Amino acid sequence: MLVFKASALLFVLLSLRKEAEGWRQYEESIVEPGEVQDNRHEFFLEIAPKLSMSIERAYKSIAIVDFNPDTGGWEERVENQLRPCGETHVIANTTTPLGQSFFQNGDDFEELVQQHGLHSRVPSINGDYPGKTLVVMMDTEIVVRVRNSQLLNSLTARIHGLDNRWYEDGEAYVQQCPVAVRSEHVYRWTANRQGTMIFRAAFPSFGPINSFAALVVVKRRNERLAVGGGASLPIHAEYMMAIQDWPFVPANQQRAGHEMDGLGKWGLGLDRDQAACTLGAQIYGQRDPRVHAPAALVLNGKGWHNQTDVLLRPSVLPLATYRIRAGNNTLFRIAHIGFDSGVRIHIEDHELMLAVADGTHTIPRRIDAIYAFPGERYNFFITGKQNPQKRVYRIVVQTVEKFPTPDDRWLPIFGLANLEYEEEVAQNEAILDEVDWNQRKCAQATSSCVIANCPRPLEGRSECLSAGDLGFPDDHDLKDILKQKVYDEDEFEEHFISINQKTKVDGYSYKSPSNIPFYSNHTRTCADDPCNKRAVAEGRAECRCFHLKQFGLGKVIQLVLFNMGPEREGEAAREIPFHLRNTHFFLVKWAGPEYAADGQTIRSFNRDIRCNNPEEGCFGGGWADSSWSRGNVGGMSDSPPLRDTVVVPYGGYIVIRFRATTAGWFMAESTRSSERQSGVAFAFRVGSNDQVTRPPPDFPTDCGTFEAPPLSLEQREAVFRTVNM
């Protein structure tokens, strides 16, 4: 990984071609931050369209590339129109399945973006997709000049995980105007959180294919791994692993085809083979035709579109490969940058030591696997085996949902990466394609597994750690907001919020305001429009409006988010990955529904929340036990984790707390693209407009809806005279 050097000259010296890293046989370890000048890091990021599986030739001509798993060769299509249509020539071959030396001529591939192995236009960052990892020091200023070189799309940018000024959080028409094509916008963020963050540039911000780059904030150089009890371990290698579920067609088209046009049967594309009609997904045993299989799971920009190849011959595929040494500690920074599916991650025959979630420490725990949902970030490390039994182990990622296969089975979509030992280890090539897909250890009667961040109980003997079980071991000065007590009304606010796939947020589907509210005398909100919420719950109506909530500046804010509501045939119950932008919160309670004796079937919604008639939407919920009001919540965690993204379990609820210290306009949203697009979001203002920090004088504000005022009599007469001259 190449780290940008902080320099004022960076803005004018970076060239797109020199900065692109392209395809690499081995993933590069994250290196130390670049030089810090005047306590800031500066970056230039150009967002431009790029065709995956292509390479650039002389004079900016593009050559189309394909990988052939039958031969293990990279082939270039012959562009001469006088030659046969399917003619290709081989430009690189593999050597052996273990030493995948794909590129004899590395210059040919210095800009190759692989993704799912097919040809798609992606919004690259300085020629790479995902963009290169940015590494900065804690408590420094991050100056990012974003240039929008896309052909058609505007964009905004934000850092998912930092808590900064409200007008630099990138929500179009709430916090800033979109950056127009061929325009630039300079963002200034403060690295006030340690850990793994996500730089995201897109418009709308919940688009299924955004521009992404990881941002790593470190406290000190040569950091060590905290393992509890004041002990620490050296880090010998440190890798980024960005995970994407890649769609066949853009997720917004899938959603529109099902909900608006009734074309869900062809959710994988109208022009695909007739045998490719979708049957939807199986989610926790329920069928849902609205959820479509991703084309691939892509790890660090490398995946493969054909699941048969992934399952039967992974050794010949061009996968992300991470190198490790026996006995060494290797840190993985996981970021789910995908659009819809939650995933489960495990590494063959290796335990994971979970250390960080969403940029904050967790209580160190040894786990066997972890679930990650869109927007979540986790750090875990593994210790290399002293005597590895094979040279290559597999990192296995699979979707939470299951999808139909040609032989009438239901299986997850799988993605793979290689964990390769640098030592010379004898490898039986006959078992190169054998993969421990479902972690045999977890199915054995003599052992059990520990799985972190489970959205619901698991089958078998596995121990499930919910998001609320991860803890926060660091000392902090916010313990006063974590007490189980009745708080005074002038220091505490409690908000009950219904968040559900079917009824969205409190029955409202979010719509952007017509102008940036800070500059508007009156912004029309959901409170200005009548809404038949019973019709919403029954699926007969939609209340789409600017949903705004008000939080008091300086107060302790408690949000009780409950995922309960009507059940409809053909719509599976799903957890909601919830993100509170620009704000870290304490997850003081995570509570699921009540399950039947099998531990899988939901018997009833959690009875802590008052919801007498779920079919009418559970709006206006409250505590069933009124003594829990104003902060006196029963069953609170003794050591609640500090998060910015967490799943709200179906049939259950979460309780989060934070102190509202920064006045401004902010967003809360589902990070699942289909839900965000359909309106699972709300805006909130902390403080009054008089308390909100005003953006700089030249901050762009001329966007949104403009309605010309009526013409005066004199103006109409002037127009009439001009027309009749």
Task: Give names to the regions the model predicted.
Residues L2, L10-E27:
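N-terminal signal peptide
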Residues W23-F381, Q386-P388, F403-D475, H495, ...:
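Histidine-centered copper-binding motifs that mark active-site loops
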Residues T196-P204, P388-K402, T661-S674:
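Short, surface-exposed ligand- or partner-binding patches at beta-edge/loop junctions that are enriched
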Residues A624-R676, F684:
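C-terminal structured "cap/appendage" subdomains that terminate the fold
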